[in-house]
Amino acid sequence: MEKLTIAQIKKMLTEEISSEQLAELKLDERKGVQLAIKSYEKRLKKIENEKLEFQNRLKIERDLWDKGIEYIAGVDEVGRGPLAGPVVTAAVILPHDFDVFEVNDSKQLSEKKREELYKKILEKAVAVSVGLSDNNLIDEVNIYEATRLAMKQAIESLNITPQKIIVDAMTIDTKIPQLRLIKGDAKSASVAAASIVAKVTRDHLMQFYARIYPGYGFEKNDGYGTKQHLEGLENKGVTPIHRQSFEPVKKILLK
């Protein structure tokens, strides 16, 4: 290999290289090169670990596929805790060859990574759907029941009827056999994919609401009770998307 500059080597190491190329680079004693190699190997190790963890998250699906259960829907929700906006759910059926190893619990991912994976899930999944319960329904039936209704809506909106449902920590009112899995978004790839779809969908909705109702910081807090949000409630009052059964919204309405 012709003598390269450190900058050229760093650029080269942004992509995967052959073991022969790596061995040759290791002969270069320049400190900058050795640091670049160390960083490269650390990144490869991280990817290797992520792939292994992903295979573990696919174990439940793989076991069911081996039993002839073809269509398995992972179901998850986001938005049970905020003071404003809907609770959003998603249902995702993954193909047997799904290999997007970075798909994980949405809470473990950056906004940029979630957006990137959201597009890949929509592109590669067998079926994807979302369900939604708005703040009025939440106030009418309570957040738990509203979440269950949104999950049922997501399942019924799939263009393929699943043979099995894996749901994160809840049960859905359906005759389809279901597996209730505590922390399912960290244990099942299908549920993890659903958590990403639900989160990105709700984030987009809250960004839309932020333009309609400025001054509450919905684009940053997603409707949660941050300082800016609480100050907005005090100064501007309650919006049509606030959950009136939630404190301190309820208290403000009584003033």
From Swiss-Prot:
Binding residues for a divalent metal cation: D76, E77, D168
Annotated Pfam families: RNase_HII
Domain (RNase H type-2): residue spans on this chain: 70-255
GO molecular function annotation: manganese ion binding; RNA binding; RNA-DNA hybrid ribonuclease activity
Role according to the record: Endonuclease that specifically degrades the RNA of RNA-DNA hybrids.
Reaction catalysis annotation: Endonucleolytic cleavage to 5'-phosphomonoester
Gene3D superfamilies in the cross-refs: Ribonuclease H-like superfamily/Ribonuclease H
Cofactor note text: Manganese or magnesium. Binds 1 divalent metal ion per monomer in the absence of substrate. May bind a second metal ion after substrate binding.
Cell compartments where the protein resides: Cytoplasm
An individual GO BP term: mismatch repair
E.C. number: 3.1.26.4
PROSITE patterns in the record: RNASE_H_2
Cofactors, names only: Mn(2+); Mg(2+)
Protein family per UniProt: Belongs to the RNase HII family.
Organism classification: Bacteria, Bacillati, Bacillota, Bacilli, Lactobacillales
Organism: Ligilactobacillus salivarius (strain UCC118) (Lactobacillus salivarius)
Record-given protein name: Ribonuclease HII
A GO-annotated cellular component: ribonuclease H2 complex
Chief subcellular location: cytoplasm
Protein origin, superkingdom: Bacteria
Alphabetical UniProt keywords: Cytoplasm, Endonuclease, Hydrolase, Manganese, Metal-binding, Nuclease
PANTHER family the UniProt entry points to: RIBONUCLEASE H2 SUBUNIT A, RIBONUCLEASE HII
